[in-house]
Regions:
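N-terminal binding-site loop/beta-alpha segment at the start of enzyme catalytic domains
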Residues: 1-71
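Active-site groove signature of glycoside hydrolases
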Residues: 100-119
């Protein structure tokens, strides 16, 4: 399951753990630790968190403990730093220092600007702060997490060594241009939402906007996942899409994570099935933007 993370020098697992769930109050400290340890035992070495994920950074840092050196930690920020205005150079600098404390580490492997719009992404002070942090050894890779126009710009920006974006059966927008562009520059690419919010769970259009959008696309595409189950089709399509380094699954259930690991362990989809998925999207979704 191990692959290279672009030209960054990092090695990552094809399957990553999205740690947003372990930051929620409903999840106990013990459950968070068991999930992280189960991920490690499954061979997962890529862990993705963010400043906005509740207590996730603190819990991940505690759970990793002495095994920190065997994993790649990806976090996200640009906001919420003590005593700083959001999306300023000072916020980036202070935010990285605070993340290091929460994660109990002396460096973050990948630090993303978290979904800021294009006009914010252009601010030179943000790039200067990232470069200083990298030169100081506090981060190894400066990155951007987001979609659409901002992603396209970031994929061409010299500051960034990786990007994170939405990629799944129902959201292939980034595969048209931004991901190939990033891959051509040997950037790492993290795919978020590889299950596309799993709209196949519903017999009727769901009420939540993000799931409803995926459900609408699923219906429009009229794609039959056979001979596979939807979950396996979705995970293998995303994890092995050209240019993708790691597909991040967000869950708090060990059995779901283990099932995802088994699916990705099956390797890439057959080429004819991949072509069918791409064709079903392009036939109706040529104008669909990335789902934010």
């Amino acid at each position: 399951m191990e692959t290279t993370f672009g030209a960054t020098g990092l090695g990552v697992s094809r399957l990553g753990l999205g740690c947003g769930g372990i930051g929620e109050a409903r999840v106990t400290e013990g459950d968070a630790e068991r999930l992280v340890h189960a991920a490690l035992d499954l061979g997962i070495t890529f862990f993705d968190v963010a400043r906005s994920y509740g207590a996730a950074e603190e819990r991940l840092g505690r759970a990793l403990g002495a095994r920190r050196g065997s994993v790649v930690i990806s976090t996200k920020g640009g906001y919420g730093a003590t005593g700083c205005d959001d999306w300023t150079g000072a916020c980036i600098t202070r935010g990285i220092d605070e993340a290091l404390g929460r994660l109990r580490t002396d460096h973050v492997d990948v630090f993303h600007l978290h979904s800021c719009p294009p006009d914010v992404l252009l601010r030179g002070e943000l790039h200067d702060a990232l470069l200083r942090a990298r030169q100081a050894g506090k981060i190894r890779v400066a990155a951007y997490s987001g979609d659409n126009d901002a992603l396209a710009w970031a994929a061409s920006c010299e500051t960034f060594g990786s990007v994170q974006c939405s990629i799944n059966v129902f959201d292939q927008h980034a595969l048209r241009d931004s991901v190939p562009r990033a891959a051509s520059r040997s950037m790492g690419v993290v795919a978020k939402r590889p299950l596309g919010n799993a709209p196949w769970r519903f017999h009727e259009r769901p009420g939540a906007d993000d799931v409803a959008a995926a459900w609408d696309r699923m219906r429009a595409m009229s794609l039959d996942p056979e001979p596979l189950a939807w979950e396996e089709l979705a995970l293998r399509f995303t994890a092995f899409a050209p240019g993708v380094s790691s597909a991040v699954v967000g869950t708090t259930r060990i059995e779901h994570l283990a099932a995802a690991a088994r699916a990705i362990g099956e390797g890439p989809l057959p080429s004819d099935l991949t072509a069918r998925v791409r064709s079903a999207f392009e036939a109706v979704g040529a104008g669909w933007p990335g789902l934010v």
